[in-house]
């Protein structure tokens, strides 16, 4: 259940359901036919992470901790986003919560560091997650596409 705590804010965010339409004028994408798609495209991230991002943009001084689904209808999904005030004394003095006051945790939601954001990054253990070995898709790609010519080879 809900419990009011000092330094914590709950935002209820409404996100429109469905896929993402490519924002092009009159459907003119230009280029090869393989990239002509406009309508049946799917966004790479979840609607929950979109909700977190919007809450984080709206409340720039707060830090996004996490979020959860609260309901949906035919048009919208509703999420509640937990935000923390990093300058509230109750947060700064509590050893369990003062980690989020550090500058490195600014805008976690924009960088895919929340639970919902991490799910779309392909991180994990085992043979199903080989494309993110090294921490990210980019790190794995860079390592596999870099030619190392050692002095003694």
Curated annotation (Swiss-Prot):
Keywords: Cytoplasm, Isopeptide bond, Phosphoprotein, Ribonucleoprotein, Ribosomal protein, Ubl conjugation
SMART domains: Ribosomal_L15e
Location of Phosphoserine modifications: 46, 49
GO cellular component, one term: cytosolic large ribosomal subunit
InterPro entries xref list: Rbsml_eL15_core_dom_sf, Ribosomal_eL15, Ribosomal_uL23/eL15/eS24_sf
Domain of life: Eukaryota
Cross-link (Glycyl lysine isopeptide (Lys-Gly) (interchain with G-Cter in SUMO2)): 32
Span list, region Disordered: 114-135
Gene3D superfamilies found in the cross-reference section: Ribosomal protein l15e (3.40.1120.10)
Compartments reported by the entry: Cytoplasm
GO biological process, alphabetically ordered: cytoplasmic translation
GO MF annotation list: RNA binding; structural constituent of ribosome
Annotated Basic residues bias: 118-131
Protein purpose: Component of the large ribosomal subunit. The ribosome is a large ribonucleoprotein complex responsible for the synthesis of proteins in the cell.
Family: Belongs to the eukaryotic ribosomal protein eL15 family.
Self-association state and partner proteins as the record states: Component of the large ribosomal subunit. Interacts with IFIT1 (via TPR repeats 1-4).
Protein name in UniProt: Large ribosomal subunit protein eL15
UniProt source species: Sus scrofa
């Amino acid at each position: 259940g809900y419990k009011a705590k000092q330094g914590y804010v709950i935002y209820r965010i409404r996100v429109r359901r469905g896929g993402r339409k490519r924002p092009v004028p009159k459907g003119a994408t230009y280029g090869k036919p393989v990239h002509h798609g406009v309508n049946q495209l799917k966004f790479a991230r979840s609607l929950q992470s979109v909700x977190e991002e919007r809450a984080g943009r709206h409340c720039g001084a707060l830090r996004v901790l996490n979020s959860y689904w609260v309901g949906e209808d035919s048009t919208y999904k509703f999420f509640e986003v937990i935000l923390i005030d990093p300058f509230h004394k109750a947060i700064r003095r509590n050893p369990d919560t003062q980690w989020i006051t550090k500058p490195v945790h600014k805008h976690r939601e924009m960088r895919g560091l929340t639970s919902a954001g991490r799910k779309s990054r392909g991180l994990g253990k085992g043979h199903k997650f080989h494309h993110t070995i090294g921490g990210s898709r980019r790190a794995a790609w860079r390592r596999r596409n870099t030619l190392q010519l050692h002095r003694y080879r």
